């Protein structure tokens, strides 16, 4: 029986060159685990990136404003992320940490696949192979979403990609070809399709922390939503995979937002319930090294750049066809009621979805490692993926889109008035586009794909509005900004709580994060 050596530190050494050769050799004896076909599944515990996109994506998006400088940033990283600056910070939640953790996860996948291949790919190892392939696709997808432009069939063959690693590395400090975005998406698709049906849910002790079949199908639905083809065939794939997740009655599998909203706003009661592994709405939960639970949450931290009252008027305090926000919790249209600090100049208005978990490092010094649990895929988000696909397929599918939006509305809001194509077209058609003097939830769209007419655009505005509110604090708004070429601003709030200066960020080329400096030597 063949045995293989995986080194927990070697992936970082390959990719970043952060350690010298002598440091690497010094660590070699203490960081090795023998892998065999019998225990190879254990390495897949390391196949999920341990850095979430939440902070970097939320800080970069229009969900965040800058407050007066008498408030402090949580750290230099938070300031860099808000200002879209090329950050040299390497701590948790940074682009560098995401890059590193994704490639470490990919290295674990490749090690597992090598063991399976050299064992002759027996059927008994199909679940390992399936999970490894889907995890490899997911880690590359996360990297592409942050470090590349949004996919466009017109430019993807020349747009810069990220290195797609398929092999176990055998050399230190190799040079990688970043290739094109087209290459990346084709490889993601190949891995995802090859792996998803090999997955077996019954091999997991805690399935929600692994790619189950439904989680893989939800990933496929989101992937194909982003992978827009000239003939729109990708939307058929979104619908096909979303159907596998949602079944014949989507309203039976989405989250019970009313029950969640009834929980205490104080403490971690609601955030813990949101990421409860027993909740059928949660398809994949990922534990991450992060301080996002401090930065965005009900603490006097990170208030210089925050989701405050003005931003909330476009999100969790926004009005819609479904009704109006009210400061009276029982009368507010949304079941999930926001927490707000009560200072003279409130800086934080948040939905209680992200708890900060603490791992004590030094009790005497009081130092900790921070962690969060991220609901990476949920039935609710998959529902809105399908609704968007129906909208983009055109008028013959608008009623299916409306049906999905009504499922969302019934679950997330108190509204009992069904949405219709006509009502949405009128409501968003009459709404002016966002301007700084008069902000609205309707912002100009400049996607690489074609929006057919006013009605389709207004349905998209409704869909984007719903997703922005529902996924607040989770980073998905930034991906919508990139995909739809949405013009956003860096707004500076004065001590009176009103808009002061602003910077417009309208160039789609800006909607990428620079790769970590350690990887700029990639070809």
Question: Which residues are covered by each model-predicted region?
Answer:
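Short coil/linker segments at helix-helix boundaries
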Residues: 146-187, 231-236, 240
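Membrane-proximal, proline-rich intrinsically disordered regions
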Residues: 21-66, 300, 485-513, 523
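Conserved, well-structured interaction surfaces
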Residues: 78-148, 175, 179-183, 192-204, ...
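Sec-dependent bacterial lipoprotein signal peptides
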Residues: 1-19
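Hydrophobic-face positions in mid-chain alpha helices that act as interaction patches
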Residues: 235-380, 415-450, 460-462, 470-471, ...
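Aromatic- and glycine-enriched pocket-lining scaffold segments that form the walls
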Residues: 199, 203-230, 236-239, 243
């Amino acid at each position: 029986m063949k045995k293989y050596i995986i080194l927990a530190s070697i992936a970082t050494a390959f990719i970043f060159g952060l350690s010298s050769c002598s440091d690497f050799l010094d660590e070699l004896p203490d960081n090795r685990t023998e892998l065999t076909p019998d225990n190879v599944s254990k390495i897949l515990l390391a196949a999920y990136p341990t850095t979430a996109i939440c902070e970097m994506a939320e800080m970069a998006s229009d969900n965040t404003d800058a407050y007066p400088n008498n408030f402090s940033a949580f750290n230099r990283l938070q300031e860099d992320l808000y200002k879209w600056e090329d950050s040299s910070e390497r701590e948790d939640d940074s682009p560098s940490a995401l890059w590193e953790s994704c490639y470490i996860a990919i290295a674990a996948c490749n090690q597992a696949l090598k063991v399976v291949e050299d064992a002759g790919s027996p059927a008994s190892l199909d679940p390992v192979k399936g999970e490894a392939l889907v995890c490899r696709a997911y880690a590359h997808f996360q990297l592409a979403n942050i470090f590349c432009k949004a996919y466009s069939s017109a430019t993807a063959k020349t747009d810069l990609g990220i290195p797609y690693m398929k092999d176990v590395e055998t050399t230190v400090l190799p040079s990688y070809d970043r290739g094109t975005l087209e290459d990346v998406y084709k490889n993601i698709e190949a891995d995802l399709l090859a792996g998803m049906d090999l997955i077996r849910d019954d091999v997991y002790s805690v399935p929600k922390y692994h790619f189950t079949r439904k989680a893989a199908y939800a990933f496929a639905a989101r992937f194909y939503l982003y992978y827009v083809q000239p003939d729109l065939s990708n939307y058929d794939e979104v619908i096909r995979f979303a159907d596998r997740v949602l079944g014949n009655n989507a309203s039976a599998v989405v989250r019970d937002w009313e029950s969640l909203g009834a929980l205490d706003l104080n403490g971690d009661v609601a955030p813990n319930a949101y990421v409860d592994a027993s909740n059928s709405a949660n398809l994949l939960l990922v534990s991450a090294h992060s301080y996002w639970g401090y930065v965005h949450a009900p603490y006097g931290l990170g208030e210089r750049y925050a989701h405050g009252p003005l931003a909330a008027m476009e999100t969790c305090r926004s009005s819609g066809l479904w009704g109006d926000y009210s400061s009276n919790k029982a009368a507010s249209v949304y079941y999930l009621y926001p927490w707000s600090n009560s200072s003279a100049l409130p800086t934080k208005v948040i939905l209680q979805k992200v708890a900060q978990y603490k791992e004590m490092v030094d009790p005497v010094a009081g130092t900790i490692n921070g962690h969060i649990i991220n609901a990476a895929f949920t039935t609710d988000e998959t529902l809105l993926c399908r609704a968007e696909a129906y909208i983009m397929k055109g008028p013959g599918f608008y009623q299916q889109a409306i049906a999905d939006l009504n499922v969302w509305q019934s679950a997330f809001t108190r509204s009992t008035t069904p949405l219709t194509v006509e009502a949405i077209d009128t409501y968003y058609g009459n709404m002016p586009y966002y301007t700084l003097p008069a902000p609205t939830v309707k912002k100009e769209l400049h996607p690489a794909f074609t929006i057919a007419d006013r009605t389709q655009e207004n349905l998209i505005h409704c869909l984007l509005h719903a997703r922005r509110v529902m996924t607040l604090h989770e980073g998905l708004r930034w991906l919508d900004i990139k995909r739809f070429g949405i013009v956003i601003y860096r707004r500076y709030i004065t001590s009176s709580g009103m808009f002061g200066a602003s910077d417009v960020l309208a160039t789609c080329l800006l909607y990428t994060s620079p790769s970590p400096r350690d990887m700029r030597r990639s070809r």
